[in-house]
């Protein structure tokens, strides 16, 4: 059966038009004009539903508000975009967006002490407790993206001129968080296998002590880096940090929400996760978890008093700027959470799917994987300079021929025009889709007469 994506969106939007009638009406019910509008819209909806059950082809949907394209890549395509794969909303999260899309929708029943993590209806307070338990830490807060978690910790721990140890694969937001606090990043080099080791971290710490005369203020390290998606020895690195009495921040932007993370077993003082990258949540969303030892500092409450009014806001947490996610982002994050918890237990299967695809890609002569292999993550960096890029050199569309071929097979998310080094993720795809994806790549290779190896 042909997909009826446009009709599904048309029906959803028509239901919203019907919903608007309810919003415009009095609490006592619909007046005569509203009843007529209801009947008219319902008739239009029934026509759309009939089209859903027919083979007829209808016109494409109009744009939202006249200018915004309908985003249907998750319905119509296999999306391998690395930063989108684990952020796809669950069904329950999409329902939450519908019900809680209005501005401060979390605040309907906010009561004293007037703080987000204390709200009981919806159960936001309980969610904060569950988040901390999820990563085996003592306390947690939701934040507008992992970057705000980095920022909160850096502003707490780093003074002007302090050094902060980071990976040479560190994300730019880690740099900015340190810079904003007045600190200076000091990068640990990767080894020949593109891995950050505990020994290299210890050497860097010693270098900093020798040069500055004092310990770094913080060690901030990615478990899985975003550049080549290798797994780094965060447990060993945390142990080294603590040997020097330096607090350790675990960057779980590519782990929290997709694979099991035990903050205390790792030795983390702070765990930062990304909701929109790895927890099936809308952007911006994320989490910061910490221990009871560090919570009084990073979650400190304001002590400031107004000089004229004597006002004070004692329950508001300074680094959080008070409340953080006050609407549908948070509720969708909460709605996805049961499924997110469950899917972390299937991580081994996700890794198997990643290796299935990479194994298929490597049968195409000249293709390489730049990430550690066998894969330990669903995100991979590959090099097709010796395969698909050879075709690009003589093709009239250059590297865009490859995007054309993938798109024709219903695959999107690769960096358009890239045929040399690029990244993709198989996370969240069913086995049926992973097999289809692997077959599509070998089909394209065969079409352009690129030699294939036999599978081992």
UniProtKB/Swiss-Prot annotation:
Gene Ontology biological-process annotations: translation
Enzyme Commission number(s): 2.5.1.73
Record bears the keyword Transferase: yes
Modified positions (N6-(pyridoxal phosphate)lysine) in chain numbering: 277
Reaction(s) catalysed (UniProt annotation): O-phospho-L-seryl-tRNA(Cys) + hydrogen sulfide + H(+) = L-cysteinyl-tRNA(Cys) + phosphate
Binding positions for pyridoxal 5'-phosphate per the UniProt entry: 146-147, 251, 274-276
Top-tier EC class: transferase
Source taxon at top rank: Archaea
UniProt keyword list: Protein biosynthesis, Pyridoxal phosphate, Transferase
Subunit structure: Homodimer. Interacts with SepRS.
Family, as annotated: Belongs to the SepCysS family.
Xref: PANTHER family: CYSTEINE DESULFURASE (PTHR43586), O-PHOSPHO-L-SERYL-TRNA:CYS-TRNA SYNTHASE (PTHR43586:SF3)
Biological function: Converts O-phospho-L-seryl-tRNA(Cys) (Sep-tRNA(Cys)) to L-cysteinyl-tRNA(Cys) (Cys-tRNA(Cys)).
Protein name: O-phospho-L-seryl-tRNA:Cys-tRNA synthase 2
Biological source species: Methanospirillum hungatei JF-1 (strain ATCC 27890 / DSM 864 / NBRC 100397 / JF-1)
């Amino acid at each position: 059966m042909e997909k009826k994506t446009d009709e599904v969106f048309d029906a959803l939007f028509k239901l919203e038009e019907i919903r608007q009638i309810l919003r415009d009406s009095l609490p006592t019910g619909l007046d005569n004009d509203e009843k007529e509008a209801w009947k008219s819209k319902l008739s239009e909806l029934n026509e759309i539903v009939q089209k859903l059950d027919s083979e007829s082809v209808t016109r494409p949907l109009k744009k939202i508000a006249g200018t915004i394209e309908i985003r249907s890549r998750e319905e119509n395509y296999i999306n391998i975009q690395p930063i989108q794969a684990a952020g796809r909303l669950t069904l329950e999260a999409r329902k939450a967006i519908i019900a809680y899309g209005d501005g401060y929708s979390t605040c309907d029943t906010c009561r004293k002490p007037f703080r987000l993590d204390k709200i009981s209806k919806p159960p936001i307070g309980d969610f904060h407790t569950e988040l901390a338990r999820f990563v085996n830490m003592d306390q947690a807060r939701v934040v507008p993206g992992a970057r705000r978690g980095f920022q909160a910790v850096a502003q707490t721990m780093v003074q002007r001129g302090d050094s902060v140890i980071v990976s040479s694969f560190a994300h730019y937001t880690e740099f900015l968080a340190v810079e904003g606090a007045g600190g200076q990043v000091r990068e640990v080099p990767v080894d020949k296998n593109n891995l950050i080791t505990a020994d290299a971290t210890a050497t860097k710490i010693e270098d900093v002590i020798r040069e500055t005369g004092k310990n770094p203020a913080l060690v901030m390290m990615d478990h899985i880096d975003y550049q080549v998606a290798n797994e780094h020895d965060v447990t060993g690195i945390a142990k080294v940090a603590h040997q020097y009495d330096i607090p350790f921040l675990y960057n779980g932007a590519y782990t929290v929400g997709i694979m099991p993370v035990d903050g205390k077993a790792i030795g983390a003082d702070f765990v930062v996760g990304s909701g929109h990258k790895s927890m099936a949540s809308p952007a911006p969303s994320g989490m910061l978890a910490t221990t009871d030892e560090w919570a009084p500092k990073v979650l400190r409450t304001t002590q400031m008093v107004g000089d004229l009014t004597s006002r004070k806001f004692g329950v508001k947490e300074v680094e959080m700027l008070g409340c953080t996610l006050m609407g549908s982002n948070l509720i969708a994050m909460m709605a996805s959470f049961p499924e997110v918890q469950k899917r972390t237990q299937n991580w081994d299967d996700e890794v198997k799917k990643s290796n299935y695809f990479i194994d298929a890609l490597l049968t195409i002569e000249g293709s390489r994987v730049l990430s550690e292999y066998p894969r330990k993550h669903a995100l991979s960096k590959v090099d097709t300079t010796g395969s698909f890029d050879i075709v690009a050199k003589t093709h009239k569309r250059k590297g865009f021929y490859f995007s054309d071929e993938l798109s024709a097979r219903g695959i999107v998310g690769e960096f358009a025009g890239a045929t040399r080094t690029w990244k993709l993720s198989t996370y969240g795809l069913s086995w049926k889709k992973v097999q289809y994806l692997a077959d599509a790549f070998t089909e394209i290779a065969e079409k352009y007469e690129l030699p294939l190896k036999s599978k081992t």
